[in-house]
Amino acid sequence: MTRLSWTEDAVGVGKVCERGFTVARDGNMVPGVLWYPTAASAPRPLVLMGHGGGGHKRNERIVMLGRLFAGDYGWYAAAIDGPVHGGRGPVTDASDPAYRQMWQRPEIVQEMIDDWRATLDALSTLRDVDSARVGYYGVSMGTMFGLPYVASDQRVRAAVLGKAGMTGSSVQRSGIDTHFKTFASKVTVPVLFMMQWDDERFERDGQLVLFDRLGTQDKRLHAYPGQHADNAPEAFEVAAAFLKRYLERGEA
């Protein structure tokens, strides 16, 4: 059984409200943040957002995306802390020993799948969340956990993934290639896969192999110059436009 509890009062800035929450799952508390439009008057799509390694539910990029999705597109957007990140542990950088130790737990990916499932269960009880129109955004660690989740939850209609692959230093540290081999072919929803051409953590060829392994036929690959932490200025708007194509299809 899952239960949503608000941990903060809603704070409104312009067209967007932000509010912290926790989801209870099997005795564990999953901390998260919800962004939503102040003027929502009908059920709206929901985008689940996974942060990168060393990040947390309120890091700069996640907050920017939450405000973009809620303020410019009128959607709900939610982020939760990954294991041992943010309110769940000490990791503030992917080089922390605790980050490597996290990946040594064979059950860690399934636990995060269950956390996301429980979070969606809980948020779906909100009046203005349209649980039939759910998207996912997550690159780097957001894909390492998010790809298996998207493959496992048929409620997700489209996903933005990337900055991850089958080879590279991050793969050697985490062993995530084993999970990608299990789950990539089970991803059947539309996917936008974004990669950095000179990524120093996930090798270029390994990212292309992961893209090829995705089971969906509705997929596209966007490559940008730069290293792992770089972002093209248009990349986030491209991601939002991709999600809009599937989450708002059929709207008047």
Which stretches of residues belong to each language-model region?
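The serine-hydrolase catalytic nucleophile loop
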Residues: 54-67, 78, 82
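A fold-wide structural signal in alpha/beta-hydrolase
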Residues: 46, 71-83
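Short beta-strand element of the alpha/beta-hydrolase
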Residues: 42-52
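The feature captures the conserved acid-bearing segment of alpha/beta-hydrolase catalytic domains
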Residues: 169-223
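N-terminal cap/lid segment of alpha/beta-hydrolase-fold proteins
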Residues: 1-42
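Primarily recognizes the serine-hydrolase "nucleophile elbow" in alpha/beta-hydrolase
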Residues: 114-180, 186
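C-terminal catalytic histidine-bearing segment of alpha/beta-hydrolase fold enzymes
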Residues: 216-252
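Alpha/beta-hydrolase active-site loop
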Residues: 95-127
